[in-house]
């Protein structure tokens, strides 16, 4: 499965009955809940990475990607925009890119 295909499925679930789909149920709870769930999954992935459990990390990484896409959908951010931003950054040094970001006073 590609991220594009998964994101398309998630977008379809935005209009589905929450009783029919875990994704629809999560999306119906709004961006805050989707962000919370993404954070939980990210922490679980970090724990597995530190433990060095490759199989568990693989599963948690899949959860992180899924929940990131759900959060993006909940916030009306298109995956194509995220990929375009990565493309924009591709030819920029990581150090230069970070120095060029807006910093609050």
Swiss-Prot record:
SUPFAM superfamilies: all-alpha NTP pyrophosphatases (SSF101386). Pathway: Amino-acid biosynthesis; L-histidine biosynthesis; L-histidine from 5-phospho-alpha-D-ribose 1-diphosphate: step 2/9. It catalyses: 1-(5-phospho-beta-D-ribosyl)-ATP + H2O = 1-(5-phospho-beta-D-ribosyl)-5'-AMP + diphosphate + H(+). Its EC number is 3.6.1.31. InterPro entries: HisE, PRib-ATP_PPHydrolase-like. GO terms for molecular function: ATP binding; phosphoribosyl-ATP diphosphatase activity. The keyword Amino-acid biosynthesis applies. It is found in: Cytoplasm. Keywords: Amino-acid biosynthesis, ATP-binding, Cytoplasm, Histidine biosynthesis, Hydrolase, Nucleotide-binding. One of its GO terms (biological process) is L-histidine biosynthetic process. The keyword Isomerase does not apply. Signal peptide: none annotated. It comes from the Bacteria. Belongs to the PRA-PH family. This is Phosphoribosyl-ATP pyrophosphatase.
